[in-house]
């Protein structure tokens, strides 16, 4: 089904307008201090460009907004800043006041919010940016957008916030739900833990919020709770209005508009070498009826990249990886591109 074309050292990949960007460390390990390189790769894995990223005082690095973003920290002077580099490695702009690597909130096209200690507006084409003031949220984590609203969790994911974009001038709270007390539960160590947003599905005018205790169906526009179910729903990958998931171990399919589970199968094993192996799954991508997952084989500690046919309900392809769970899968044309934080592989569809 897929033929491997190449394998390269990589700690992160990103696809931006069909351009393949990759970060790698000189010694092949996922750690700083050995030289960081930014690559642009062709669909066949050839290096189109290569540039070193300045490492002195580097704190965090990532690929966002079609650029390489690097948070630097000069602790001796008490100064932190973010520098954005082009795919070719040229320094484009430096931004002070974020205090660390920001969360990135897309606004459309080349416009973004950068969320750190302060909230910034940022245009990745013009490089214009503006400090919009201190971010009022406690440990915010961006969870996505739906129905014209942006969603954050805060306070160790105990609260969900719906925010309205004020035309690039900031984000205004529309509603919030607090699960800390209402969904308390006994944790792994026998202690009472606050309720948290574990899984969030945004579709149409529904937000499906799963905690350790139950699942809430919430009206995205108002925050009103429409229904409560005494079970959890995983985060689905949606195609054609149907959400699919193998996580944590059963195949589920859900009509997202109606909120109806169409399929909830028994716990799956992975067929390999004539055996049915116990395993866990991490959903990565759904495309053309195939659900791509990272498979953890519990008996060996190894990981696979596998494709699951959602109609036939069986695995149709896999490739063995190493000892790390895969982070991401992308499809560009007839190329499948996957990364596990140490390595990127490019496959051609046959």
Model regions: which residues?
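Short loop/turn segments that connect beta-strands within beta-propeller blades
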Residues: 42-44, 86-89, 123-127, 165-169, ...
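Intrinsically disordered, low-complexity segments enriched in Gly and acidic/Ser/Thr residues
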Residues: 229-230, 246-322
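A short beta-strand motif characteristic of beta-propeller blades
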Residues: 1-6, 46-52, 89-96, 128-134, ...
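Repeated scaffold domains used in trafficking and secretory/extracellular systems
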Residues: 6-18, 52-66, 97-110, 134-149, ...
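An edge-strand/N-cap motif at the start of beta-rich repeat modules
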Residues: 1-46
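Structural motif
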Residues: 28-39, 77-83, 117-123, 156-163, ...
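Solenoidal tandem-repeat scaffolds enriched in leucines and small polar residues
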Residues: 106-216
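Short beta-strand elements that form the blades of beta-propeller/WD-repeat-like
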Residues: 18-32, 66-76, 109-115, 120, ...
């Amino acid at each position: 089904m897929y033929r491997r074309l190449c394998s390269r050292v990589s700690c992160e990949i990103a696809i931006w307008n069909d351009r393949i960007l990759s970060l790698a460390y000189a010694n092949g390990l996922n750690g700083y201090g050995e030289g960081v390189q930014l690559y642009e790769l062709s669909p066949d894995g050839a290096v189109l460009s290569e540039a070193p990223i300045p490492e002195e005082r580097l704190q965090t690095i990532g690929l966002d907004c079609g650029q390489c973003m690097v948070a630097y920290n000069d602790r001796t002077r008490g100064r932190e800043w973010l520098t954005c580099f082009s795919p070719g490695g040229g320094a484009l702009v430096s931004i002070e006041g974020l205090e660390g690597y920001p969360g990135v909130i897309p606004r459309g096209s080349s416009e973004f919010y950068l969320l750190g200690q302060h909230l910034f507006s940022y245009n990745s084409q013009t490089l214009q940016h503006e400090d919009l003031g201190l971010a009022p949220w406690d440990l915010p984590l961006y969870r996505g957008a739906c129905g014209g609203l942006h969603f954050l969790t805060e306070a160790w994911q105990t609260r969900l916030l719906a925010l309205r974009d004020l035309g690039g001038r900031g984000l205004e709270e529309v509603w919030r739900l607090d699960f800390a007390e209402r969904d308390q539960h006994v944790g792994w160590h026998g202690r009472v833990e606050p309720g948290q947003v574990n899984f969030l599905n945004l579709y149409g005018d529904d937000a499906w919020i799963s905690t350790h205790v139950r699942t809430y169906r919430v009206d995205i526009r108002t925050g009103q709770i429409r229904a409560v179910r005494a079970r959890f729903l995983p985060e689905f990958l949606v195609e054609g209005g149907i959400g699919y998931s193998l996580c944590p171990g059963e195949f589920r399919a859900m009509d997202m508009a109606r909120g109806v589970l169409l399929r909830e199968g028994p716990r799956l094993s992975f067929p390999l070498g004539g055996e049915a192996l116990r395993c866990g799954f991490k959903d990565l991508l759904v495309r053309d009826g195939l659900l791509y997952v990272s498979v953890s084989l519990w008996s060996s500690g190894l990981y696979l990249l596998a494709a699951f046919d959602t109609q036939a309900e069986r695995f149709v392809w896999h490739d063995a990886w190493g000892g790390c769970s895969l982070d991401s899968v992308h499809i560009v044309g007839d190329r499948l591109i996957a990364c596990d934080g140490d390595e990127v592989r490019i496959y051609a569809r046959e």
